[in-house]
Amino acid sequence: MRTREKSYEDYGLTKEEIHYIKEFCFNSNTEQQKEIIKVALSELSPYIASKCLESLIHNKSYDDLCKEEYLYIGKDDFYGYRRKGMAAVKRWMIWNHIWEM
């Protein structure tokens, strides 16, 4: 299955977990939290990782990012990789004993 076609459920993420990950990323105020997000997203290509990082930390949608600059990735692909990145953030949170769900 292509990354763009995978859903949150395919990554084993529930609605509560999605909300928890988004809140963790948006409220990441320590260097440790930001480093966990960066390392987790490093599983993606550097360009996609940087855009997913900006999206998660600043709570920006694909359209918000497109208003600032042209994105070299389609909307479906962007959100597919963002979901994959969120699953990676969850894994890194578990490995670093930060996951509290």
What are these regions (language model features)?
Residues 1-43, 63, 70, 91-101:
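N-terminal interaction/assembly modules
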Residues 32, 47, 73, 77-80, ...:
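Short, well-structured alpha-helical interface segments that form or flank functional binding sites
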Residues 58-76:
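Helix-turn-helix DNA-binding module
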